[in-house]
């Protein structure tokens, strides 16, 4: 019996959670269900990767979204009165757009409504969308947030949800520690991955510019990824005579800072910023070592994808990483500080044969295979097939 899902997300950009949403939605329609994706701010970058049967809607149009982010950037650069007035007007338009969307959705009904990212409140779904079940997906680890109190404002809304799904054991445990009253409705389901699509996309030939061994990182240029810290590590190893190049896929608010630090450290011939790509997998397959230097994660999806492609992985000890890798066997896990990253990377550069052994992809069945995740998810939805 087909089930009708509405999945609410702030925007479809090139992020880890957004990419696994593609796999999740495609898995549902593959099994005969209806899926509609609702963006708060229309971006739609990932739309071509969804199954053609997935439908889309947006609360705030693409034209408004572009004006909103342009105005936000101007306010950050020059917070003068005029900029604030323009920005506040655009925020007012969002409220108006939500009222229009509420009228539109009053005539629609769904079996399950999902708030797919914890950074956006589920209030719109709870107040304006008719559904039999409401589910909150929680992709981060609240213990690593600089300001976990910012999540507390959603506490009452989460109490109204039928279930909360966390994507790592650490994430679930820390969520329950902060919100013990939600323990009974909080569950662990790993992200969905389309292994066949990842393997197929990786077959596109690619050769990296620069020195070998090639180090690769994939992720937005934001503070949690700690790319500035990793540049210090690379400069130190360069000064010690090690050969390598580091390639980064992604964009973000820290790009300018990263570019400036590359110049200051004279790493222009060692570090390559490729920007956003719709196919990171051809890069992953061609790299010598995949590096996750993050300060914190909820459950890093890029390391799962790298292991699916047989990449050796060096990763900081963030939430979820020990659910993916066995240190010294299927990956190399280091403490989450600059010195540990330096020592770990230096050791692997000195022992390339160990890197090759770390290509082994074992012990990730629970993380990678979708069947068990699907069964647990439908049990939460109380859907019988």
Predicted region positions:
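A conserved mid-protein helix/loop that constitutes part of the nucleotide-sugar donor-binding site
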Residues: 18-23, 213-236, 242, 248, ...
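Carbohydrate-associated surface elements
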Residues: 170, 192
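Nucleotide-activated donor-binding/catalytic signature segment of Leloir-type glycosyltransferases, i.e.
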Residues: 259-275
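Aromatic "clamp/platform" in nucleotide-sugar-dependent glycosyltransferases that forms part
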Residues: 276, 295
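Short acidic/histidine- and often glycine-rich active-site loop of Leloir-type glycosyltransferases
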Residues: 301-305, 318-328, 332-333
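Short hydrophobic beta-strand element within catalytic cores of glycosyltransferases
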Residues: 312-315
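Conserved acidic donor-binding segment of nucleotide-sugar-dependent glycosyltransferases
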Residues: 327-328, 332-338, 347-352
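C-terminal alpha-helical cap of glycosyltransferases
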Residues: 364-385
